[in-house]
């Protein structure tokens, strides 16, 4: 449970039907070792009919394929252990269809099909129980073939989405460059002050005496997102405070602005005090970030002694802990 909470739990934005993202993060962000026991079995209490089972497998395959292509850096270097003999089971069906399309004799094609099917029965006799050997092969023959088609379709759709994403991004950059060069129209950068709350009292802070007042001056996410949207495409969107990560809705603000005004760069300063909160908020942003950069500036006032003198005891140590933890995210989101 502690590990689950430490690395951010489940990724709600990753629609894969399965929780594979959690295991990948556990391996890449910590020293955790995932061990799969060959004797482990699980029983799902689902009342499947053939077509409901087929429908779920097709959806799972589509979503998993799309998610893997859409998050290549996350899945890079990972392997999924599936018995190679399972992958052979659907092969007789496409080979039969191809041979028929090429004009082969139906009896010859059927002979090839039955020969390959018989070979599958021999290879998979240790996978299926004796009573379900033939039925299991028939089901996976059909379902597996449909899963292949679903995976190919997901790949095709992904590249269409990717082309559209790059074209829209290019258009937004072009609009911003025209504005910047000719100094015309709406701004290409905006800075939004999202909170006056801060946990530190730095000596040089020009409004340290007014921090944490009863009215922190925090606009709701909807207002911040709407104002950014009204500026149109942005080159740079900056958040300011206070300590921005003190807002529980921080990731909602950033993700909303990214969706509505497509800034190429999103940046903010932090004192690095809240290690886990900063990590989880950053993770939620990166999980939704498909284009552009997300930049975090750490406020450092010198070596540990001088830094702590200005910002408070242990502030340098906490900053370093936060930096080290965020750096691990580069393994997943370079």
Please describe what each predicted stretch is.
Residues 168-294:
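Conserved alpha-helical substructure of the radical SAM core
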Residues 268, 323-334:
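Conserved strand-turn element in the central/C-terminal portion of the radical SAM core barrel
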Residues 1-8:
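Conserved nucleotide-sugar donor-binding
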Residues 11-16, 20-76:
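Catalytic donor/gating beta->alpha subdomain of glycosyltransferases that bind UDP-sugars
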């Amino acid at each position: 449970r502690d590990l689950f909470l430490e690395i951010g739990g489940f990724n709600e934005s990753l629609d894969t039907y399965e929780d594979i993202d959690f295991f990948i993060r556990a391996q890449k962000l910590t020293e955790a070792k995932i061990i799969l026991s060959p004797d482990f079995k699980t029983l799902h209490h689902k009342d499947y009919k053939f077509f409901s089972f087929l429908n779920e497998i097709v959806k799972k395959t589509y979503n998993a394929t799309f998610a893997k292509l859409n998050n290549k850096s996350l899945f890079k270097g990972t392997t999924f252990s599936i018995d190679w003999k399972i992958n052979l089971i659907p092969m007789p069906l496409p080979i039969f269809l191809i041979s028929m399309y090429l004009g082969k004799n139906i009896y010859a094609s059927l002979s090839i099909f039955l020969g390959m099917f018989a070979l599958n029965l021999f290879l998979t006799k240790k996978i299926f129980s004796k009573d379900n050997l033939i039925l299991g092969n028939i089901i996976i023959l059909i379902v597996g073939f449909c899963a292949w088609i679903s995976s190919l379709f997901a790949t095709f759709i992904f590249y269409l989405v990717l082309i559209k994403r790059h074209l829209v991004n290019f258009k937004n950059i072009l609009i911003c460059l025209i504005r910047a060069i000719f100094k015309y129209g709406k701004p290409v950068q905006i800075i939004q002050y999202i909170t006056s709350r801060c946990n530190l009292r730095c000596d040089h802070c020009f409004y340290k005496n007014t921090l944490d007042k009863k009215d922190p001056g925090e606009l709701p996410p909807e207002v911040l997102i709407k104002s950014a949207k009204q500026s149109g495409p942005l080159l740079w969107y900056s958040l300011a405070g206070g300590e921005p990560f003190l807002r529980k809705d921080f990731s909602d603000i950033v993700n909303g602005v990214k969706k509505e005004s497509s800034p190429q760069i999103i940046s903010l300063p932090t004192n690095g005090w809240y290690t886990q909160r900063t990590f989880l908020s950053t993770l939620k942003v990166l999980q939704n970030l498909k284009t552009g950069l997300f930049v975090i500036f750490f406020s450092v006032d010198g070596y540990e002694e001088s830094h702590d003198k200005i910002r408070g005891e242990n502030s340098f140590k906490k900053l370093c802990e936060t930096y080290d933890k965020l750096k691990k995210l580069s393994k997943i989101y370079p």
